[in-house]
């Protein structure tokens, strides 16, 4: 159950339980039943016999109109692979309030649009002193949304309930401080349920270290999900975390300190404990099938669309 001010979402596989709960709540609060959930705080929910579809198409169209991008030319990716954003200290400044409004609005949209998570996060790093070069990248995101307003997440009905995760990192991608970006995502069966794109807190000295830190962050999320699911009587062992760097995988299995790892912050090493206790297992995956890649860098159109499909993103049925 989720409560937001005076809005309550509840559900059950047994309709009589829903009715019983609603009756109990009505005894304590003045309330009315709105029926099957179809809309909540900008989130559109379409419940079908073979699954559930989530999207924010109405919100997307409102954003395009609010920021005068509704007549813009559509484009196929939210960010070009040639884009290299930096502070652009000599560039022409742009209104900070407007820029922050655009970023904040786009961040809310990432609740159902993981395909723009990286590009929005990258542009968000320049909110303190936005330039026209940064605005250009933000407008490209809107142009991408112009061509894909109905995209959303599809959660198919399935008996498969495996917990699988993907972890990836670029290396020194931030041109300001050379820190890397971690990207992670987690699936329950075929359903994408969690994703992140976040700049790392320290500068990595190698690709392996950057990937190791990303895997550690992914492990933390997996452990939380695993513990939450155990409250519902669902237990997992050896949850698979997919990584495309063999050196990083080896680091999770080798507790010995040496020149390559002695400087890494101790909090990143907790993944070793969970590997040792068979809570998670890191498995190698080829880079072209690394789904977390979309959360670490701009991709070419073919790879971007492939990963987007694999994440379960479809047009509204």
Feature-to-residue mapping (PLM):
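Two-metal-ion RNase H-like nuclease active-site motif
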Residues: 105, 163-175
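Catalytic palm subdomain of template-directed nucleic-acid polymerases
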Residues: 1-30, 44-55, 91, 125-131, ...
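C-terminal reverse transcriptase regions that engage the nucleic-acid substrate
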Residues: 33-151, 286, 294
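Structured nucleic-acid-interacting core domains from mobile-element enzymes and related host factors
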Residues: 144-167, 234
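Acidic, metal-ligating active-site segments
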Residues: 174-190
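Mobile genetic element proteins and their domesticated derivatives, centered on retroelements
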Residues: 6-8, 21, 25, 42, ...
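Active-site palm subdomain of RNA-directed nucleic acid polymerases
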Residues: 1-5, 9, 18, 28-35, ...
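RNase H-like nuclease module associated with reverse transcription
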Residues: 39, 162, 180, 191-192, ...
